[in-house]
Amino acid sequence: MEHLRPQLQNNGGATASQRVSRSSWNGIPTLSLVSYLAGSVLFLYLSLFVVDVGTIYQNGDQLIYLENAVKMLEGQTMYSDFFQFTTPGTEFVYLCLFKLLGVHLWIPSLVLILLGSVAMGLSLVIATRLMSGADVFLPGLLFLTCGYFWYLDGTHHWFSSLCVMAVLAILIENRSPARLLAAGGLCGLALCFTQFRGLMALVGLLVFLFWEHRDKRQTVAVLLKKLACSVGAFLFVVLGFNGYFAWKAGFENFWWCTVTFGLKYYTGWPGNTWRMLALNFPRLHQWSHELPRVALYLFNIGIAPLVYAVFFYYSPRIRRSCPGELVDRLMLLGFVGASLFVGIAPAVGELRAISIYLPALVLMVWLFRSWGKAGRRTLYALWITALLLAIVEPASRQTHWRAQLILPTGRMAVLDPLTYDMHRWILERTKPSELFFEEEVPRLYFTLDLRNPTPVPFLTTTEYTRPEQVGGVIKALAAHQVRLVMTSPFLNLPPYGRDWGDHLAPLRAYVATHYQWVKTFPNGEQVWERQEAER
């Protein structure tokens, strides 16, 4: 840190002359800005679509939210007709898009392009308030290539994280009442996608306001006004948005799904605990191919806590060496970002870590700029890595083995033979809107335009799946005489070789009694057809 003082003084953002330049924005040449944003869109497009083939199939939790939105489009009520543990923001976004554009396979991919592009833009807004030069592009580029690319899964994580990034972009300039109202509302909006993230964003903001009050020796009246703006706007959005869904589903149903379930049963699945670190760890079949992925995994998991630990350790020296306005901006990122990490710490997984680490990436680049030649060399290495990944990652998608399927929801590019075989086999034996049930992972409902008649999106052999939910599945299969059911061999085995609360025995008995086996896929999943006598 021997070069801390002179470097920090050069990290304060764009100069006044740069800001007034007609050919630049915050000191960034217009051509560079356009290239950055257009390049981000192109990167995401080539990662989500195969040219002249179709939308790349993305397996992930987004398929649950898409299925739920289709159910809502057809008149079902979330939390009463079917289960969901997150607040309704994600389904609401997809529902609005389906009403406006129709149910199409490309819609979630379009959403992912928009989410990624806006995140890149917000990171740039924040970075330009802390530093100048080409390094302002690096946090967003690292986020895109090291993190976002690996989890192109349009779930609540990305929506809520974008809201929090917008909070930082709004407040980093100043904390006027109008800006605090907007920030509090955005924290509330984040909660409408991910309960704990919105709450922790507000906690981080409030901690910063208390710190600022003490550091600037503001009056209590000023502090109370700021708190009232933030908390008031937060509550207004949370109660206003969620209140409608609670009223429609019934407050008891809404509370059980979004609060009680999370407190009592969410951690019943090992993947929602610290064990997620082991579950996410890349499988090392071929070391030469997997080592880069392992390096990315370790970076994605570890960078946020490491950056915040280093930042707060050096914060006294930073406060002595930097202008007051810059210190305020850095502390805002530090408090809110660290609060977000605390929110995911009990169940750190790679997706959760990536979804909250963009503020940490901005701080990381700023810190490296402050550490003289060693920091500059590290930044060069990060630039080279990010630029290489920006070329290799979309190129790998475009040159990968692929097959095309013409589905009821659109043209789909499939990048693995198993997924292709599953879709083709089921497609040939079903028709759009037909009832169908997948036990473990809902991979086929949205793409094949099939309907899950049960109240749950998937089942587990843990306390995460409640006995009454299993009963609801059996009741729905019987009431609707569902013809095809797909079972998973993994639901016959306890996770990690121990009993986590398996309640599926009645369902196994029901399927064995009323269905007959017709197909086994290479991964062991089976399709069962209702016996002829019962149709």
Model-assigned labels for residue ranges:
Residues 165-182, 214-218, 290, 297-327, ...:
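Membrane-interface transmembrane helices that cradle and orient dolichyl/undecaprenyl
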Residues 152-160:
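Short acidic/glycine- and proline-prone juxtamembrane loop motifs at membrane-interface regions
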Residues 159-187, 206-212, 360-363:
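Specific aromatic-rich, kink-prone transmembrane helix
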Residues 144-148, 180-195, 201-209, 236, ...:
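Membrane-interface alpha helices of multi-pass inner-membrane proteins
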Residues 110-131, 166, 311:
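Transmembrane-helix motifs of polytopic, lipid-linked glycan transferases
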Residues 199, 339-341, 345-380:
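Hydrophobic/aromatic-rich transmembrane helices and adjacent perimembrane loops
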Residues 412-464, 470-496, 521-524, 528-530:
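Short periplasmic/luminal acceptor-recognition loop of GT-C membrane glycosyltransferases, typified by
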Residues 123-146, 161, 178-182:
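Transmembrane-helix signature of polytopic, membrane-embedded enzymes
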